């Protein structure tokens, strides 16, 4: 190990460290260490219990039997055996499916965001994190220590490299086509952002960006390229780490709820090279005493590094750093704000606000068996310590009983065989013996003594009690249904009790995973890349936008035990038998897909959900003909309806005509109308005869027709009565009616009594 041999070189002075923040009430290292020193006693008391539990599992320390010469030191690992049975039962529900998290929206506005978060979260646990290793450590830490402590963080590694990017020149839009292209791009970005990013030309994207900034419509033309330095992310994903409970000290005044803790302090090992990678985060590295901060000089830090091993290279030399997460009034306004600080030795190298978006401590505690009003839980070792000690004592007694016996040895009296025959006896040859001493009676064969039945019963009782305490059912006896009777109901009661105990532990583990998922969701919405490509299946990929991950969500962890899955599959199978073949085929396929999911057959489940039956051409043609037949029958029915409507209208019209005819006959209207027709016919005949007389050629010597007499006669027969009987009356009427005035253009000769003597004949 490297030593500081040059005593003339002064150590760095931590008091000369650079101020790290602009806070009004910047914290001092002494204030942070005061919290550490105040919480150490309660933390040490808890770690003593954890060490006792681990000693019981590993048979170390006080749990290891003392050495006694000639006596057995065997100690059965009862606690370890029960834990080994528990590991696989608790890890399989988390690893049995590729889909670990299920995200549901709180409001309808978060539906799309919930689906995106579910895709990203499950994708990260499948590809970015070693899910198998984490779940194994997660379960083993909880089962062994009674409490699992998970630290959630974010890993971002970038590399700067030079790339050629296009250079554009912007010009005012001159044609309608350019304006339409810009308008279509703006509309596509709103309707289909993914299609916009994938299909739109970079020049149009540049025009859109300029339009967003200035509001001016332009079109871009690439004029060349330029080399610029861009950041290429090498890693950008969340991290989850199982912490050693000895290396994290939590506020003991949190009343069993870590969310109420005012601080949590973690010690971890690092080196100068790791700190230099993050120059923007860590400062004052030149003030650190790297030699005195090695793990061997930090007794409160638990490490797996051997004490005799230490790297001499100053850049790789391991040192212990303390990271403080808590809440302080940094502005002096009475408001506690989340902060994080890191120090090595006596030098504060980091002090800033909590960078995580939820503003909480980045730790999740998962108890195995909860203890009232305590944030730490208890493992099975707390229950099995006495049973393991008793079982070990009984087992050592039985082994000592067998080991101290002279098994396989023979004894005989002295003088039974002489020297020659004794040698023959030992070499397996025929020998002679003294006839007074029968070898069958004199030679004694030593064997193992019979084990006392009480010892075997005691060992069996300890195993049964251990399995009853933990609820773990082993192959070799243990928890049985004999106390309930050797019937199916009794056995089912025992299995149900064990499965309920196991499910209760699983729920606590699932709750811890849910809290981890919630913290990662909050980080994804801030730290994730603008676009993230997520693999859904072997052929399907989805691009997730960081903006879509914001919202309020409920997160569930999809877990189930083999017993529960088997029971569900049996229930679904019984449901299929109940509904029979008379239900829609799609419902049957969905139920079969659920059964395939429960049996861990994702490919079969996917095939069942996406299967579409291929139609039979003959059946399809018959269906089409049946549809056409139904359409024709429908048209025929419509035509009959139209015919019935027309006949009904005709009947109504005939009824109206009959009613009208009846009314006209009763009122004399029809008779009067007939008279009018006859009168009009006679007048027409008269006028026809007069016209014929006027147009008929006269023979020589015939007199002309008397038109006045004919007109007068027509007037008499037509019943015309003007009321004017003489010339004097005509002159008086001419003053009011120009039809009686001889000089008027409206003069009517048929009304003049002088021209129509027949007018006077009527009276």
Curated annotation (Swiss-Prot):
The entry's cellular-component GO terms read: virion component
Question: Record keywords: Transferase included?
Answer: no
Specify residue ranges for compositional bias: Polar residues.
Answer: 680-689
Q: Which Pfam families match?
A: SU10_portal
- Ranges for region Disordered: 668-706, 729-763
Q: Please name the GO terms of the biological process aspect recorded for this protein, alphabetically.
A: symbiont genome ejection through host cell envelope, short tail mechanism
Q: Does the keyword NAD apply?
A: no
Q: Which InterPro entries match?
A: SU10_portal
The encoding gene = 59
Spell out the protein name for this chain: Probable portal protein
Compartments, record wording: Virion
Q: How does it assemble?
A: Homododecamer.
| Protein task | Forms the portal vertex of the capsid. This portal plays critical roles in head assembly, genome packaging, neck/tail attachment, and genome ejection. The portal protein multimerizes as a single ring-shaped homododecamer arranged around a central channel.
Question: Which UniProt key words apply to this protein?
Answer: Late protein, Viral capsid assembly, Viral genome ejection through host cell envelope, Viral genome packaging, Viral penetration into host cytoplasm, Viral release from host cell, Viral short tail ejection system, Virion, Virus entry into host cell
User: In which residue ranges is the amino acid composition biased (Basic and acidic residues)?
Assistant: 668-679
Species of origin: Enterobacteria phage N4 (Bacteriophage N4)
Highest rank taxon of the organism: Viruses
